[in-house]
Amino acid sequence: MGIQKILNKEALYSVPVKIFTQDTDSESIEQLKKMAQLQFIYSHIAVMPDVHVGKGATVGSVIPTKHAIIPAAVGVDIGCGMNAIRLSLKASQLPDNLSRLRDAIERKVPVGFALHKQVKAKASSIIPLEKRLEPIIKKHPGLVRMLRQFDATWQKQLGTLGGGNHFIELCIDENQDVWVMLHSGSRGLGNVIGTYFIELAKKEAQHRFGHVPDKDLSYFAEGSKSFDDYVEAVEWAQEYAFENRKEMMRLILEAIRPLLPSFQMTKEAINCHHNYVSRETHFGENLLITRKGAIRAGLDELGIIPGSMGARSYIVKGKANPESFCSCSHGAGRKMSRSKAKVLFNQQDLIEQTQGIECRKDSGVVDEIPSAYKDIDEVMANQSDLIEVVHTLKQVLCIKG
């Protein structure tokens, strides 16, 4: 299906908002209307089927800008995204009881606020990041003050999961092949970089001529020092997130090898961001594309769309739909807040909805219950013009942050 709803221009400088679903909450609509009023938005805002209200900007939005960038639209989990790889294993080769595999992964990969006791990542990953980070810190020493034990923390967090909706999964596809899939971002330093520059943009907006419809939409104009510094920092955080997922995948495979028959990694491997900004060309224009909870879906480009814990996930191939700026959804999308989910559901509900999956089933993860998310099959049906399904995955083991 294609565009299902268009919010037409409501102000002199506003652009249309093109939405690939009918299921859009009123708060998201109001957020999108405000963003559409920014004079540097190009052509239109595209909204994916997993849309829901977000902090700073609407989750599921694709924001094309010319000569400006909005730090809050990228957010604080800069470079958050997915990594998946197919193994040369069949489902029948997995043990009946997956608890030992889960224990082995949890011992190898710190989750939540935890970090490695020693730096685990290889020097080939650390050194390039360290060299690129030095000039950023020199220009903005305030970043160091925002993160305890700065150098040790960012290095020891490389190869760690984090919390919230971040996860590690073992999945089975339609051919009974085994996949490892994970979801994580740029960890503590990415959060610090995002927070620091969001506040800097708000501070600078107070002294800039021109109306901003919401302080969360404060921006840096191209040509300014802050614009250049933010682009440098956000690109660093995106690379860190990419390397974090690579390192985690290495550790996971290292953890499960002793417990499984000999296996190889296949060439089907994907590592993609879904909270990020990049320079791209669309409609013949050089643009900054911010994907806030959306993945790139260029022609035949592979991507990952995870469902909620207990639902299906998808490996997809892009169709390069121009109206979406070559994008698609990044998941199912929440249909309620975490606090509301904790009120509506209990531990028994979680146990019932995750039956057959090796995962946490305690009250601490009730906010991640499948019913708190939109129906992934409906989300996928709404974006058939954007992507083609390559593989359908079903989780058998899930580790939450």
Please place each PLM-identified region on the residue numbering.
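Domain-length cofactor-binding catalytic modules of enzymes
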Residues: 2-31, 40-45, 53-59, 63, ...
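Beta-strand elements of modular eukaryotic interaction domains
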Residues: 36
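A generic, well-ordered mixed alpha/beta core segment in the N-terminal half of proteins
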Residues: 73-139
